[in-house]
Curated annotation (Swiss-Prot):
Assembly mode: Homodimer.
Function: Catalyzes the condensation of pantoate with beta-alanine in an ATP-dependent reaction via a pantoyl-adenylate intermediate.
Entry's EC annotation: 6.3.2.1
Pathway: Cofactor biosynthesis; (R)-pantothenate biosynthesis; (R)-pantothenate from (R)-pantoate and beta-alanine: step 1/1
Reactions performed catalytically: (R)-pantoate + beta-alanine + ATP = (R)-pantothenate + AMP + diphosphate + H(+)
Main localization of the protein described in the UniProt heading: cytoplasm
Top EC class for this record: ligase
Catalytic residues as annotated in Swiss-Prot or TrEMBL: 37 (proton donor)
NCBIfam families documented for this protein: cyt_tran_rel (TIGR00125), panC (TIGR00018)
Key words, A-Z: ATP-binding, Cytoplasm, Ligase, Nucleotide-binding, Pantothenate biosynthesis
Source taxonomy: Bacteria, Pseudomonadati, Pseudomonadota, Gammaproteobacteria, Oceanospirillales
Protein name in UniProt: Pantothenate synthetase
Amino acid sequence: MITIHRVKDLRAAIRQQRTQGKRIGLVPTMGNLHAGHVSLVKQAKELCDYVVTSIFVNPLQFGANEDLDKYPRTLDADKEKLVAAGNHLLFTPEVSQLYPEGLERHTKVITPGLSELHCGASRPSHFTGVTTVVSMLFNMVQPDVAIFGEKDFQQLAVIRKMTRDLYLPIVIESGPTLRETDGLAMSSRNGYLSAEQRQTAPLLYKLLQESAEQIENGDKDFAAISAEANNRLTKAGFVPDYFNIVNSDTLSPAVPSDSDITILAAAYLGTTRLIDNISVHLG
């Protein structure tokens, strides 16, 4: 595996692979890699000849009071995991390399509508930061395929919309959410949880499963299902952000006639924001 820090070196390395007819895959990450990230790299290897993983803690997608400064940076351990997974190129730019004029003066990529719902309502500038940096990575690497995890379901939908709207010749693939043995979705932020919070955290997925089962069994009172889940989260010590039952394609509120439904959930446990989702296919 080679490690590259500068855009011009990245482009030169990619160009060399292109001249050999290689199919390029991209896995964008913010580092602190876990088994979920590694599974995306392995998926990229199955689909492509040459895999590029980026590690960049993107300041543009963090709000003013969020965890940019304390976000875990574990580059040496990340490199070991990537080498073991068979990754070919690691791109780890400095902030000054990607945002030479600073964040305020940098051109932004905005996906109206979809990016304003759910997580976007709570974190207004978050998805603008995501789509901006991902579009930059797409332009630098020009991959044939890019792979994102399904745990960040809304992010995946936003990136698909951006790719479609801008006519980018990139196939967006997704990898399934990997979970701990007790059901908690793997996340780089799980390390923030105290031992007691870690015991409580799996309730979020348990409620998603129970709510999905209710819907599969014919319960279409989505508002009541959401209200009950939020109430149980609150009683357990969470501060719910949302527990929304949506159309899987549009992410707008689900209606009883929808056949593909996703339940999106976000809640704070202490200062840690956990997100998760589950999909329901009816008929």
